[in-house]
């Protein structure tokens, strides 16, 4: 994933920086990545700027993703759905309309509980999303600035204890939900459209891509 549009470098103009992102940067990486991403958030990139990034990525043949609604309600979720994004990550602050839009779309809402705890933001409303019918994934968002663990066990446990998911829901979000966020189509019936073993579930014919824990 190419996330060149994460934050504006200190001292730079946002639009001038995006000229670089959608120009020489994208040209340099487009043959080496599958996705383009943008942080659509106050203090980062606004709706118009984010749309510019995603449209450039689409024109380059990339799938699109969005980071958004981490610090407050904003246009990130609706933009993600409008642009056909595979996922929108963070989703801490959602209006009822945001939840409805997600539930009616194929865009996966990715919960990042370790990041939420590290940044002391309100945890994303996983229970409301699932109850509304949205597809949910869980990820670690491991990075040195805002999420300090790679432990999916911790993330799943946090989703259960603090975001009110059932254990089954949390495990499904961390496996099948993640596969759907990667647009691994036909999850669960053995093969993807290219005939490769499906990911994200334990069924006959699926790829044995799994993590077995000796734990109680």
Where are the model-predicted features located?
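Active-site-adjacent C-terminal substructures of enzyme catalytic domains
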Residues: 63-64, 73-198, 213-214
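Metal-coordinating catalytic core of metallo-dependent amide/deamination hydrolases
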Residues: 1-75
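Loop/turn positions that initiate beta-strands
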Residues: 205-208
